[in-house]
Design a protein with these regions (language model features):
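C-terminal motif of bacterial Sec signal peptides marking the signal peptidase cleavage site
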Residues: 17-20
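N-terminal, intrinsically disordered, polar/charged segments of Gram-positive cell-envelope systems
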Residues: 25-66, 70
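Extracellular glycan-recognition surfaces and repeat-rich motifs
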Residues: 75-112
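Extra-cytoplasmic beta-strand recognition segments
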Residues: 76, 123-153, 182-185, 212
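Extracellular beta-rich ligand/substrate-recognition surface
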Residues: 111-124, 171-174
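Extracellular ligand-binding interfaces
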Residues: 140-175
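Extracellular carbohydrate recognition and processing domains
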Residues: 162-192, 202
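Short beta-strand-plus-loop segments that form exposed binding edges in beta-rich domains
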Residues: 196-205
């Protein structure tokens, strides 16, 4: 009787152990899934400040379009920010998108639009063109909007060449009161130019950026 009882206990213990191994495997799988999901979430969170484009195009051949512009999607006529790396710094800008309201465009039918009601506006954008011929280039950009009473907003465009950055300030001076920024005399020695912009305003700031061109002088 004792042997039968002992045998039953041993069988039950083995069954529990086997079941426990199965559960442990399941828990490990779940933990691995959770870890992978967490890692994915962390990666997405790190990239969450970057406004994704459907396809990140880049001009690596130094070939201009039919208008002589070396930038891709300089007038934001694509449905996304193709060609540009647009970053919503600290995820504070509430609206940062392609705007299809022609009245808010400098040229074409769309523009880059930004707005924040409760948070500050803070975003940056850039695009690199490589494979350029030797010569001198000129960057031109247009911006309009309002800084919501911010007396010291950060609004500038830049050209980065050979590790040196040249800046030109922009202004938010009212609805469709466009301010044109120009940076002439850009002379790369390695065939590459990075152009971009940075905008920071108090809560309530809004505006659009449009028709950015990089042409050979």
């Amino acid at each position: 009787m004792k042997r039968k009882l002992l045998h039953a206990v041993l069988v039950a213990s083995m069954a529990v152990a086997l079941l426990g191994c199965g559960n442990t495997s399941g828990i490990n799988a779940d933990a691995e899934k959770t870890q992978k999901a967490t890692e994915t979430e962390n990666i997405e969170e790190e990239r969450g400040t970057e406004v994704a484009a459907a396809e990140q195009k880049e001009n690596t051949t130094g070939t201009p379009d039919e208008n002589g512009n070396y930038l891709i999607n300089g007038s934001f006529e694509e449905p996304d920010f193709s060609g540009w790396t647009v970053t919503n710094n600290n995820d504070v800008t509430e609206e940062l998108d392609v705007y299809d309201r022609e009245t808010d465009c400098f040229a074409g039918a769309q523009s880059l639009h930004f707005y924040s009601g409760n948070n500050p506006v803070d975003f940056s954008m850039k695009q690199t063109v490589s494979g350029l011929e030797d010569g001198t280039y000129k960057l031109t950009a247009h911006i309009q909007g309002d800084a919501a009473g911010d007396e010291n907003p950060t609004v500038y465009f830049y050209a980065l060449v050979d590790g040196e950055e040249v800046k030109a300030d922009g202004k938010l001076q009212g609805y469709v009161n466009w301010y044109t920024v120009e940076i002439p005399g850009i002379t790369p020695t390695d065939g590459a130019i990075t152009v971009g912009a940075h905008v920071v305003t108090a809560p309530g700031g809004w505006g659009t950026i449009d028709d950015i061109t990089l042409v050979k002088e």
